[in-house]
């Protein structure tokens, strides 16, 4: 799709243009493949992945209007793959020269406030959001769950950095299930229903393997600008991975920082234990009412074993192996 084909949300446009543009948007949406997910939401397939109507419009807004800066950093992931943790780590690393440990923004703000979503926040609320009021500047920090193909539409040849984190599919499933039910306040969504949805690929931002593969291939083709991280490696070798992340972001730790415990200080600040214990994350919420505490659960590797049957394990393992065949990637 070329730039001239991308429709715009015209709330801020001239009255006479609004009607035509909204028809263009409707026309695009009606031309896309659609399906219903396990929650009853109608999804549309765009650039390889599924989105609801509002998120799709936000992605189109982003594709049309986003102006990248050379120093931009974008944290990307499939939902419930370690996004909150990676946002905290990336913010702490990239902004560490501006904040001391005593007055650090992570002590009084949730990571999702400090690293806003492009399609779930900024471009969902406005077709042309004011990006001069971001919590971070030079570098600006953003996040996304959209596919790599959708993300790179406005980036073109921009040298901005993209950091992607993937996680074991079975742990993603259980974490997503717990999160969805905590959002509703009821246990209306069964694990079995979400499991079948994930296996079919018809779920928000899915298919999971397409989301992961896009960024995996991007990291192989352009390792200078796309970094592919694994949640499990962040858990087992955090010091190695955070130093790798700092190098990628062009803000490596100095010898003085390492000698003075700078690496461990950031790891402690951003640990799920520390973040979940902060008052802001116990009692605060996003503007749309999502409680901050819903973003923190166990964060353990292998927690899926307490929930999934051997049959579910075998089925999803076979699907993932088939979908990733020949890519060189294992989840």
UniProtKB/Swiss-Prot annotation:
Residues binding 3'-phosphoadenylyl sulfate: 80-85, 167, 175, 231, 297-299
Expression induction or repression: Up-regulated by trans-zeatin.
Pfam short name (any one): Sulfotransfer_1
Compositionally biased spans, kind Basic and acidic residues: 1-11
Compartments (UniProt record): Cytoplasm
EC number: 2.8.2.-
Gene Ontology terms describing biological process: response to cytokinin
Membership in a protein family: Belongs to the sulfotransferase 1 family.
Entry function: Sulfotransferase that utilizes 3'-phospho-5'-adenylyl sulfate (PAPS) as sulfonate donor. No activity with brassinosteroids.
Tissues of expression: Expressed in seedlings and roots.
Location of the active site: 145 (proton acceptor)
Location of region: Disordered: 1-31
Protein name, as recorded: Cytosolic sulfotransferase 8
One Gene Ontology MF term: sulfotransferase activity
Gene3D superfamilies named in the record: P-loop containing nucleotide triphosphate hydrolases
GO cellular component terms attached to this protein's record: cytoplasm
SUPFAM superfamilies per UniProt: P-loop containing nucleoside triphosphate hydrolases
Source domain of life: Eukaryota
Entry keywords, A to Z: Cytoplasm, Transferase
InterPro entries: P-loop_NTPase, Sulfotransferase_dom
